[in-house]
Amino acid sequence: MTTANTNETAAAAAAKNRRNKKKKRVCAFCADNIDRIDYKDVARLRKYITERGKILPRRITGNCARHQRQLTKAIKRARQIALLPYTVE
């Protein structure tokens, strides 16, 4: 193998790695310096629920573990007092 072929192969491999690398999602609550998630903030909670009414997982939302736990509790509490539906008709 010549030096030119080696450089081309290395460049192609580096480009392939850049394409496959996913960008790390940042927790929206940490970015906004929100300490506690309020169950009465229905507009914010709706962003983390699917159209079927399920809570979106952490790998999709990008939340940290602490805020994902708080978010889940807030959504469940909002459902109990009928601010959010359990299911969508």
Curated annotation (Swiss-Prot):
The lineage of its organism: Bacteria, Bacillati, Bacillota, Clostridia, Thermoanaerobacterales. Residues 1-22 are annotated as: Disordered. It comes from Caldanaerobacter subterraneus subsp. tengcongensis (strain DSM 15242 / JCM 11007 / NBRC 100824 / MB4) (Thermoanaerobacter tengcongensis). Part of the 30S ribosomal subunit. Forms a tight heterodimer with protein bS6. Binds as a heterodimer with protein bS6 to the central domain of the 16S rRNA, where it helps stabilize the platform of the 30S subunit. Belongs to the bacterial ribosomal protein bS18 family. The keyword Ribonucleoprotein applies. InterPro entries: Ribosomal_bS18, Ribosomal_bS18_CS, Ribosomal_bS18_sf. This is Small ribosomal subunit protein bS18. One of its GO terms (biological process) is translation.
